[in-house]
């Protein structure tokens, strides 16, 4: 038996290490899986230079004397909590990215939505950017990219449904856009359903 170890030569250029708490779900020499809290951006952006998961990961790797560029395999919106997979080297990034592309990594979410949904369903509607917005997305049959969301209702309470959601695709804001599209937006979603009741 042979063992090959991939050594990384780069680091997280441009990402300022910040001593923020990390909830590590799993780690080995190739990957790091983190439990991302809600309200934490993944990448630095305008107004978020040192409070992101990337900053926390940079600090973590710096403390371990590991050179690991920030390679997120999956994406989560700022307000979404859940497992985020980081590849620690180019080989694991290539393998995991191929698995994502081939839909071999299953992404399942829990979400509360307004109203009582059917017991289960599939939303297959292309998603594209709203023309005058950098952030907002919409169902766009003409110019959008393919997007498929499966859901199963787990519970109903106070005219809200708890859903288990499985994504076939990973479009920006896919759950928020698709649930709103079928008339069951996420409550108090500041971008797609800014109604606070």
State the predicted function of each range.
Residues 27, 116, 154-156, 189:
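Residue-level recognition of beta-strand microenvironments
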Residues 146-148:
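Short proline/glycine- and basic residue-enriched helix-capping loop/turn segments at helix->loop/beta transitions
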């Amino acid at each position: 038996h042979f063992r090959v170890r991939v050594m990384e030569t780069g680091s997280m250029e441009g990402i300022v290490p910040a001593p923020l708490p990390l909830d590590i779900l799993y780690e080995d020499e190739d990957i790091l899986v983190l439990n991302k809290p809600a309200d934490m951006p993944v990448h630095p952006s305008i107004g978020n230079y040192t409070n992101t998961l990337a900053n926390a990961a940079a600090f973590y790797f710096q403390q371990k004397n590991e050179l690991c560029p920030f390679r997120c395999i999956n994406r989560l919106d700022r307000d979404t909590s859940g497992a985020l997979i980081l590849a620690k080297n180019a080989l694991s990034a290539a393998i995991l990215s191929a698995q994502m592309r081939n839909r071999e990594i299953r992404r399942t979410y829990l979400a509360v939505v307004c109203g009582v949904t059917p017991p289960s369903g599939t939303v297959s509607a292309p998603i594209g950017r709203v023309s005058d917005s950098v952030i907002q997305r919409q169902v766009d049959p003409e110019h959008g990219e393919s997007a498929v969301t499966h859901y199963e209702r787990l519970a109903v309470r106070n005219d809200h449904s708890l859903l288990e959601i499985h994504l076939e695709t990973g479009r920006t804001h896919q759950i928020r856009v698709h649930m709103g599209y079928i008339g069951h937006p996420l409550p108090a979603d500041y971008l797609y359903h800014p109604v606070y009741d």
